[in-house]
Amino acid sequence: MYAPIIKLSEIKNFLSSNSLVAQKKFGQNFLIDQNIVRYIAECSKDFFEKENVELAEIGIGLGTLTYPILEFERPTYLFEIDRAYIELAKTTYLNLFPKAVLYEGDALENLHHIFSKEVFIFGNLPYHLTSEILTIIATEFKNWRGGVFMVQKEFAERVTGEISSLSIFLEGMGKIEFLKKVNKKCFYPVPKIDSALIRILPRPKEERLFHSKEDIAVWSRLLRTFFWGKRKQIQVSLRDSPFSQDPKFQEAVRKAWEKTNISPTSRPEELNRKQFLTLGQELLDLLS
């Protein structure tokens, strides 16, 4: 089954007849390539189809991806802020799927409803909220089973390939994979840059770096300290960063890099992901 508004002509007609324009502040660029829609569904189903896992979608828009998600006939939690698309969902397809629950308003204020759910998440994420949403998922969702997200291609390359504060932070929770570049012409209105699909799968609980709010705070503090001066030696950042001005924390970090054979003259970009995770685990052990 396809969404009621899927062709480019249908989208333009819907927007025009309702005196609507795509809202840049909400990151509204509507996916119009059905090959990509099918790809998202196909590359995700193995992670929830055989188990009792629920689904969620952040930003349903015109329902292009929502329809195939709802056809899995799982309890599904939908998040949408724009009144026009909330009303579209209510008047066209929500009544066909009794297992769907729609949360109206800002997703950042509503995601708490599913923090404890065993859920697989989909989302076409606005650029200005991408990091915040992924951080919330990494730190607040206790039982989530993974997610596939549409993000800007530059962000996808950075979070999957580069050594950055966010990529290493998320690595402590799960595995991040670059799935597919999505050409900007697959959207309407056509954005200025290409997008990409990433998949994040959480590590088994026993392998996750952080297990409590306190762990998260320590891990975040370590990364903020080191990446405060990305091209500085980590010993310099530890000494000078505003995030590390605590003798107990500084001493624990020094002991941690000694035990993990990481040189204090290293720069963050010279360390690999495994070294960061090993260092983080040692630091958490020392401070526990």
Residue ranges and their predicted role:
Residues 1-221, 225, 269, 278-281, ...:
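Catalytic cores of RNA-modifying enzymes
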Residues 55-65, 230, 257-258, 263-266, ...:
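Extended, compositionally biased low-complexity polar/Lys-Gly-rich tracts
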Residues 190, 213-262:
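Long, well-ordered amphipathic alpha-helical subdomains in the mid-to-C-terminal portions
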Residues 246-288:
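Conserved Class I S-adenosyl-L-methionine
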